């Protein structure tokens, strides 16, 4: 039996955490004053000139949807110019950089066998790699399951000491303090990275120069069934095969995915590690890299993920993402001069639009349904045709983005997927509402996403 051991993580790893900029500080007095002014202005407007205020809000919402649709088409067009050469791999020899694989785990006993098998399938010299599997102190079931999976010597099981906030980035920082690698990658419990992904990343870092700080592997969802699973897969196809390639092609920062981020360890340490108070530490890190003058590029070899398959699993995960986007927006608008104008636009185009569009999906859909009913009864509202046009524009551009992204991943899009997206979008408003409530009441709470193991997919 391969020997493993539990290494008690060093609490002094706190030096890796950020003091500024960090989500720990919340909203600044200036940000709170601006928000209060907007709310008061809207309230006075509704009391004094309700019709005009509602009309202005309606126009703003419609304009937001049109802008999002045009941006989506623009990113699809730009992504088509992104060069997709076959993956170039580094030779498997003793000159390869040492790789540290960080795997934060919490209540993942069912996934222990799968993640150990997925890491063992990586085609990288064992003498040049290590894996640190971080388990919380009270998570005895996951620790026991990891031992039962018989991990080899190059996999270490680390126990994170009790502490707050209990988040994934905190666990990653504790592991980073013990990591020996020149390069670092983060994987989640449900991840199944392509066996050659580390070799591709090592080659890309060697060729990319010292200012290449990060490589993002695409996250793919294999063809699956079920409403939430398929919509989730198409979300990923749009994100990783249209939006991110377009941003990289334009030379702009990207909001990193929550896993399969490959980084130079010296760069990551110089940046202070991950912000343990940000529940989308990946999105924040993408902008922090750009602010510090580092580039991010994309890999071709993917990581296969397991989608959320039910509303009960989807809602807290999506709410956590949106809460983290809000945290990141607060961090990077606290002192707007940190980012140049172009990167500020990207910040709002990616994270800001995601939150705002999620908030207004359901209200706009309900409003349109009421207008349609009145139109059928012979009393069409003056804005009904405009609202219907806005919806159809958003629907069609989303369909184009879904098709373009899915075509690159091999995911088979069905006409029903596009039709059912009309029922999927309004659910984002529930997630956005929960995100805002949690940002106020439980800003650093990490909603855990449950996972179920799947048979390992053989990478093409």
Could you describe each region identified by the protein language model?
Residues 69-128:
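N-terminal signal-anchor transmembrane helix
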Residues 120-163, 206:
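Acidic donor-binding segment of Leloir-type glycosyltransferases
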């Amino acid at each position: 039996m391969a020997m493993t051991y539990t290494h008690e993580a060093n609490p002094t790893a706190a030096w890796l955490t950020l003091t500024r900029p960090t989500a720990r500080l919340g909203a600044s007095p200036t940000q709170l004053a601006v928000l209060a002014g907007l709310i008061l202005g809207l309230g006075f407007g509704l009391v004094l000139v309700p019709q005009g205020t509602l009309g202005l809000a309606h126009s703003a919402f419609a304009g937001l949807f049109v802008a999002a649709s045009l941006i989506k088409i623009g990113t699809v067009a730009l992504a088509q110019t992104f060069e997709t050469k076959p993956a170039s791999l580094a030779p498997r020899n003793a000159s390869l950089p040492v790789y540290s694989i960080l795997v934060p785990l919490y209540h993942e006993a069912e996934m222990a066998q799968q993640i150990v098998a997925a890491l063992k399938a990586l085609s990288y010299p064992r003498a040049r790699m290590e894996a640190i599997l971080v388990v919380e102190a009270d998570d005895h079931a996951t620790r026991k399951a990891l031992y039962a999976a018989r991990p080899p010597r190059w996999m270490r099981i680390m126990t994170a000491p009790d502490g707050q906030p209990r988040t994934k980035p905190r666990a990653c920082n504790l592991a980073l303090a013990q990591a020996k690698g020149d390069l670092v990658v983060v994987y989640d419990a449900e991840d199944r990275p392509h066996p050659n992904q580390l070799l591709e990343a090592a080659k890309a870092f060697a060729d990319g120069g010292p200012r290449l700080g990060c490589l993002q592997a695409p996250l793919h969802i294999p063809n699956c069934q079920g409403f939430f699973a398929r919509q989730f897969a198409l979300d990923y196809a749009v994100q990783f095969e249209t939006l991110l390639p377009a941003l990289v092609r334009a030379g702009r920062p990207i909001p990193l995915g929550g896993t399969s981020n490959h980084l130079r360890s010296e760069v990551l340490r110089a940046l202070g590690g991950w912000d343990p108070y940000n529940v989308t530490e990946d999105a924040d890190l993408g902008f922090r890299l750009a602010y510090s003058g580092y580039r991010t590029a994309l890999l071709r070899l993917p990581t296969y993920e397991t989608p959320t398959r039910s509303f009960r699993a989807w809602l807290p995960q999506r709410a956590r993402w949106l809460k983290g986007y809000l945290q990141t927006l607060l961090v990077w608008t606290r002192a707007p001069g940190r980012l140049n104008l172009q990167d500020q636009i990207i910040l709002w185009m990616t994270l800001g639009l995601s939150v705002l569009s999620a908030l207004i999906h359901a209200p706009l859909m309900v409003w349109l349904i009421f207008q349609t009913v009145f139109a059928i009864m012979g009393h069409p509202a003056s804005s009904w045709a405009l609202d219907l046009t806005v919806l159809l524009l958003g629907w069609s551009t989303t369909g184009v983005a879904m098709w373009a992204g899915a075509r690159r991943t091999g995911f088979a899009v069905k006409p029903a997927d596009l039709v059912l997206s009309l029922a999927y979008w309004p659910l984002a408003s529930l997630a956005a509402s929960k995100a805002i409530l949690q940002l106020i009441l439980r800003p650093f709470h990490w909603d855990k996403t449950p996972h179920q193991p799947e048979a390992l997919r053989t990478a093409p």
